């Protein structure tokens, strides 16, 4: 039986259409899901939408829509963007579904039966945007939210139900000590630990005077807090379509989740509240939470007030899915903050994909049509000496790329693959097969061309989780009918295609065509100072 790997993005809040940060998270999750599928794993990749809460209620009211109609429209927008970005998720979890309601009620009952929910008085400053109470020490000048800096917080004084988070302080510290990789990168782990060590306070899990949400099972006059509800969307997504919606059915195959991928703004919910809730319900904790940074544009924080937001729909429509996927995976070290510059975007894509990779394939194919009758040279890859410069680099890549993906070091995978592509260009220039062909050195020419074509194939395979359409096009020009989208052919599974010497001798090649057209900067960007 194939091993399992389950991963999630956050369930995105549907106050507005997806922004570039949501796209960034989901691209990374899709890349990892594709890698594990190629490794032969059964994968459950979960994304979806978080659809309850006061913010949704207010936004829908402002738009003249019912909350459900608003949620349906925005959820469809997320699904449309994921399709444009070639995101192959397995489950799209919506927290307004009746099946989710059943899971939430059962989970609540477990926590209630464990004595971890009680009625208390809640006073404090509340950010509607975050759907969260803020401590006084966190607030910016003018009682503004530290995350939504243009929003002032509201004073709340109400009687709510609380979860005994403080009860799990030591259990959380013990878990972090026993599982040092539970939250990564280390800077984020240290941030969570510091917060826990300062002392945890019980948090409210219900709201009054809020219609848009699930009622508290033990008190229908109150509504469950959006985060208590939303986090359980990861569990609901594990149900098979035919399953009765129970925790036992949801958890029987895919739990615990191997990896949650989140942004740093929701770290406390995932790194503190969520594991404590699971402990209370007697459920295993996720294996790992990986936290990425924020994106800026041209070195500035993005925001509507600054007029510098980056529309992911427009970006994909202009440049294509693979271009967007490649830039963010290669240029932003996952786990750190990153920047988008359209000038750099175009420069990187032209240099890496059009020149280093695309041009190498194109020129080598043209020579193969001219010198080896339009076929892969009649050379056995295994017979190429191990000290051959391209084989050495290729075998190093095949041995290290998997670790790069598993550690979410996508930028390193891209750099290693590019190193081989650039070496292929250098090797071709130095060996000058056109000169050696004229000198009658046909065997040497065949070996040169084989080594370059095999290097390009390996680069395409290694980068397939990031640029699946381009990798498929490269394989097609090398004479394969292999697909990297949809169902995966058995020939692609495992590491077989990651080895040196896979390209069959004498395989007919396709006519050379550019795989990636050079990009042009829009005039408005090109003319800006």
Swiss-Prot record:
- Residue ranges for motif 'KMSKS' region? 301-305
UniProt keyword annotations, A-Z: Aminoacyl-tRNA synthetase, ATP-binding, Cytoplasm, Ligase, Metal-binding, Nucleotide-binding, Protein biosynthesis, Zinc
Say yes or no: keyword Aminoacyl-tRNA synthetase present.
yes
Which residues make up the binding site for ATP?
304
GO cellular component terms, A-Z? cytoplasm
Entry's localization field = Cytoplasm
Its BP terms in the Gene Ontology are: methionyl-tRNA aminoacylation
- Positions of short motif 'HIGH' region: 12-22
Cofactor (UniProt) = Zn(2+)
The record's free-text note on cofactor binding: Binds 1 zinc ion per subunit.
InterPro entries the UniProt entry points to: Anticodon_Met (IPR041872), Met-tRNA_synth (IPR014758), Met-tRNA_synth_2 (IPR023457), Methionyl/Leucyl_tRNA_Synth (IPR015413), MetRS_core (IPR033911), Rossmann-like_a/b/a_fold (IPR014729), tRNA-synt_1_cat_dom (IPR032678), tRNAsynth_Ia_anticodon-bd (IPR009080)
Enzyme Commission number, as recorded: 6.1.1.10
Query: In which residues is Zn(2+) bound?
Result: 127, 130, 145, 148
Q: Which reaction does it catalyse?
A: tRNA(Met) + L-methionine + ATP = L-methionyl-tRNA(Met) + AMP + diphosphate
Query: What GO molecular functions are on record for this protein?
Result: ATP binding; metal ion binding; methionine-tRNA ligase activity
HAMAP family attached to this UniProt entry = Met_tRNA_synth_type2
Q: Give the matching NCBIfam families.
A: metG, PRK12267.1
- Stated family: Belongs to the class-I aminoacyl-tRNA synthetase family. MetG type 2A subfamily.
Assembly and binders: Monomer.
The protein, known as: Methionine--tRNA ligase
Q: State the species of origin.
A: Thermosynechococcus vestitus (strain NIES-2133 / IAM M-273 / BP-1)
Source organism phylogeny: Bacteria, Bacillati, Cyanobacteriota, Cyanophyceae, Acaryochloridales
Gene behind the chain: metG
């Amino acid at each position: 039986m194939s091993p399992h790997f389950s991963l999630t993005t956050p369930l995105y809040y549907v106050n507005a259409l997806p922004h570039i940060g949501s796209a960034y998270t989901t691209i990374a999750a899709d890349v990892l899901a594709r890698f594990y599928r190629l490794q032969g794993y059964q994968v459950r990749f979960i994304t979806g939408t978080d659809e309850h809460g006061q913010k949704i209620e207010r936004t829908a009211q402002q738009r003249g829509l019912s909350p459900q109609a608003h949620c349906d429209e925005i959820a469809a927008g997320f699904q449309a963007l994921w399709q444009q970005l070639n995101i192959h998720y397995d489950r799209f979890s919506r927290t307004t579904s009746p099946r989710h309601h059943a899971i939430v009620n059962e989970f609540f009952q477990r926590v209630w039966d464990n004595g971890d929910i009680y009625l208390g008085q809640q006073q404090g400053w509340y950010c509607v945007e975050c759907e969260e109470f803020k401590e006084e020490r966190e607030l910016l000048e003018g009682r503004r939210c530290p995350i939504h800096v243009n929003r002032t917080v509201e004073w709340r004084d109400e009687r709510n139900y609380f979860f005994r988070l403080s009860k799990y302080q030591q259990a959380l510290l013990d878990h972090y000590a026993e599982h040092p990789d539970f939250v990564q990168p280390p800077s984020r782990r240290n941030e969570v630990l510091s917060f826990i060590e300062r002392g945890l306070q019980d948090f409210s899990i219900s709201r009054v005077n809020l219609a848009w949400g699930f009622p508290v099972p033990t008190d229908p006059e109150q509504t469950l807090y959006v985060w208590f509800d939303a986090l359980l969307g990861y569990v609901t997504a594990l149900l098979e379509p035919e399953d009765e919606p129970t925790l036992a059915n949801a958890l029987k195959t895919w739990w615990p989740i191997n990896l949650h991928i989140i942004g740093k703004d929701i770290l406390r919910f995932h790194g503190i509240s969520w594991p404590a809730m699971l402990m209370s319900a007697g459920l295993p904790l996720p294996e790992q939470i990986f936290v990425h940074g924020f994106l800026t544009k041209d070195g500035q924080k993005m925001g509507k007030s600054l007029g510098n937001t980056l529309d992911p729909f427009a970006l994909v429509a202009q440049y294509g899915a693979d271009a967007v996927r490649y830039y963010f995976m290669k240029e932003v070290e996952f786990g750190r903050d990153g920047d988008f510059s359209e000038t750099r975007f175009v420069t990187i894509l032209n240099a890496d994909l059009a020149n280093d990779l695309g041009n190498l394939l194109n020129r080598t194919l043209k020579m193969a049509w001219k010198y080896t009758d339009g076929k892969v040279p009649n050379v056995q890859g295994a017979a190429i000496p191990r000290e051959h410069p391209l084989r050495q680099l290729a075998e190093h890549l095949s041995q290290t790329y998997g670790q790069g993906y598993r550690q979410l070091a996508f930028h390193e995978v891209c750099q290693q693959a590019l190193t081989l592509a650039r070496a292929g260009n250098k090797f071709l220039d130095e060996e000058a097969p056109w000169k050696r062909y004229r000198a009658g050195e046909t065997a040497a020419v065949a070996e040169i061309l084989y080594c370059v074509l095999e290097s390009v194939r390996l680069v395409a395979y290694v980068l397939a989780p990031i640029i699946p359409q381009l990798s498929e096009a490269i394989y097609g020009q090398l004479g394969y009918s292999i697909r990297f989208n949809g169902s995966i052919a058995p020939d692609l599974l495992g590491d077989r295609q990651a080895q040196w010497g896979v390209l069959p001798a004498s395989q007919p090649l396709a006519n050379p065509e550019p795989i990636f057209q050079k990009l042009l900067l829009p005039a408005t960007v090109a003319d800006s100072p």
